[in-house]
Amino acid sequence: MAPKKVLLALTSYNDVFYSDGAKTGVFVVEALHPFNTFRKEGFEVDFVSETGKFGWDEHSLAKDFLNGQDETDFKNKDSDFNKTLAKIKTPKEVNADDYQIFFASAGHGTLFDYPKAKDLQDIASEIYANGGVVAAVCHGPAIFDGLTDKKTGRPLIEGKSITGFTDVGETILGVDSILKAKNLATVEDVAKKYGAKYLAPVGPWDDYSITDGRLVTGVNPASAHSTAVRSIDALKN
């Protein structure tokens, strides 16, 4: 029996975003933690982005977010994580039938490109239609902005419960005004737009993830591992 496979999506957006001039992009642990979780459970993992390129969110490289074994894995060019990243694919190089889980990692960069990432959305929709799981963490649910259920033609999240980075969190980070200026939808905006029920954690930094059938979402970097675990459980069930 062929090993189960996960398609782990990254944002292609990597440009100045924060008020201090730092770039946003992929939030490291939101890709690293799911990757390591899936690999530990025996899954093969491929990385994909809409353009086949990616860059790191510079704030996610700070010691507060990247330390210990995570930092070791990230800096080791021979780590399983980095070797797999080096083979990142474009959607055109991917066959949705090969994968059982689509996992959208995050970083504020996703708010820029996921809603327009039609090829990534098509693959996610196909994996879901095939009976697979679609998961997203933190700002990853931006992928649901325009993502349809192939079987119904309706928005994938319509009538479902999701979570994701909170509007309160955006305010605490001081980026709410930046999002408004750039006309970027928050995860809560996306939920409202498509008729999903948004469930918030008690605190914006809590480890909090939820499952609604084969749809799995998590709220922040601390939830990346639990979101991956829930994805595996949803596939088993």
From Swiss-Prot:
The keyword Cytoplasm applies. The keyword Cytoplasm applies. This is Glutathione-independent glyoxalase HSP31. It is an enzyme of class 4 (lyase). It comes from the Eukaryota. GO terms for molecular function: glyoxalase III activity; protein folding chaperone. Keywords: Cytoplasm, Lyase, Oxidation, Stress response. Catalyzes the conversion of methylglyoxal (MG) to D-lactate in a single glutathione (GSH)-independent step. May play a role in detoxifying endogenously produced glyoxals. Involved in protection against reactive oxygen species (ROS). Important for viability in stationary phase. May negatively regulate TORC1 in response to nutrient limitation. It is found in: Cytoplasm, P-body. Belongs to the peptidase C56 family. HSP31-like subfamily. Induction: Up-regulated 10- to 30-fold during entry into stationary phase, by hydrogen peroxide or diamide stress, by heat stress, and by growth in the presence of the proline analog azetidine-2-carboxylic acid. Its EC number is 4.2.1.130. Homodimer. GO terms for biological process: cellular response to nutrient levels; cellular response to oxidative stress; chaperone-mediated protein folding; methylglyoxal catabolic process to D-lactate via S-lactoyl-glutathione. Disruption phenotype: Results in higher sensitivity to oxidative stress, reduced thermotolerance, accumulation of higher levels of reactive oxygen species, and reduced chronological life span. The modification Cysteine sulfinic acid (-SO2H) is found at C138. It comes from Saccharomyces cerevisiae (strain ATCC 204508 / S288c). Pfam families: DJ-1_PfpI. GO terms for cellular component: cytoplasm; cytoplasmic stress granule; P-body. The lineage of its organism: Eukaryota, Fungi, Dikarya, Ascomycota, Saccharomycotina.
